[in-house]
Amino acid sequence: MVKQVEWDWTGAEQEYRRAIELNPSYAMARISYAIHIYALQRFEEAAAQAERAQQLDPVSPFVNTWAGAAYFFAGRVEDARASLQRVLELEPSYSDASLVFARNYVSKAMYQEAIVELQTALTFNATEPFVLGALAHVYGRVGRVEDGLKLVGELKRIDAERGNVPMSPFPFVWAYAGLGDKDQAFVWLERSYQQRRQRMVWLNVDPLLGPLRSDARLHDLVRRMGLPTNSPPPPG
């Protein structure tokens, strides 16, 4: 949605609501709206929209993955687990489901479970940048700094090979946040802000930004984006 890319949160919500009014049975409209209000920390509303999307399209990996995110932060932990497991049973290589699973684990400080989930995802695609960045983050959280830095090196290699089509800055943000290098994390986060990367919309809810949560630089980014803050951030 254009309004979300422009960080016009009210306008984006109006667009999503209008899309649902035009076609109430369109699962993608409902899960997209769920993702939007999840980013705004309206977790129970997001879970309700995600549940309706699942009813409309029960086998969609995209729908089930983001339902898993919405359910988790609405306190429906078992529903979240079931949704994500459903995705990975049908499509084990669907890395977004592994990422959401891992982020949910990080929220609960279940770091070993997160590591297993991400390592499994890498068996299907060993160069998936977001999985590498998330795993580097978790390695940092458990003191495996050298292992995390090796993954940062791999990310740099992948980025360099892309030439004029650089990858998203977010894998670096996650990695450096977990490894305790806040200055580098904010260098890449600022780059993501300047590029208006889609993952910026989750600034208030991303557990992999947990180590940055109290930093004034994160608060400044939230302010510049005009992101509403409706509840305490999730742990991370």
Language model segments and positions:
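Alpha-helical protein-protein interaction modules
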Residues: D8-G236
